Design a protein with these regions (language model features):
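Nucleic-acid endonuclease domains
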Residues: 1-82, 87-200
Length: 200
């Protein structure tokens, strides 16, 4: 074998490691792992819009139409005439976190919605958004995320807020009312009640 062909062998070995570590291989949602980041966001927006339509909740969600550079002017759309920024994340291969890129001005929406997709279920977390001061002073993001602060890279640019299955399960366990776990047994009516209980 020569150095040129060595790369073929190294790539094949790495691909095999990926296949073994692929948490999505048996998931109904497996194709989300293959989508580009922007398309993952579109999936979340479409999901939330269709849930609202099913439950006859007034909504107009289409980030492509509402988004401005750096986090937009009022999020990805509206639910019950309130602006909502929707962030969709897929569980990383290490199964440790959902990474939410919030943009440069995340405070401009009234509400934030996180749609966190894991191989066997989905977490939908909706909460009243934080103020500009809250984001910029990196305060803890309670009550939903009392141990987390948004990250602001170098004090400028985009903000980020990562969550995890454990954090989401904690929100549910403490009955905070801001997170619901969507499984094969979850009904549209349950999701409608959940959305209506938060967005007034």
């Amino acid at each position: 074998m020569n150095p040129y062909n060595l790369l073929v062998s190294v790539i094949a070995a790495q691909k095999q490691k990926e296949l073994v570590a692929n948490i999505w291989k048996d998931s109904k949602y497996k194709y989300i792992a293959e989508l580009e980041s922007n398309n993952v966001g579109n999936v979340g927006e479409n999901l939330l819009q269709q849930i609202c339509e099913n439950q006859q909740i007034a909504s107009s969600i289409d980030g492509a139409k509402t988004k401005l550079k750096g986090g937009g002017d009022g999020g990805d759309g509206r639910i019950k005439n309130k602006s909502v920024e929707i962030k969709t994340a897929r569980l990383g291969a290490n199964q440790a976190s959902f990474q939410h890129e919030l943009g440069e001005h995340p405070w401009k929406a009234d509400y934030m919605a996180f749609i966190d997709v894991a191989p066997a279920h989905i977490y939908l977390t909706i909460f009243p958004n934080f103020t500009e001061e809250h984001y910029k002073t990196l305060l803890k993001c309670g009550p939903c995320f009392p141990t987390k602060s948004a990250t602001w890279r170098k004090g400028e640019g985009a903000f980020k807020l990562d969550t995890s299955p454990n954090i989401n399960e904690n929100i549910i366990e403490k009955k905070m009312g801001n997170c619901i776990k969507i499984t094969d047994d979850t009904t549209f009516d349950e999701l409608g009640v959940f959305i209506n209980s938060i967005i007034q």
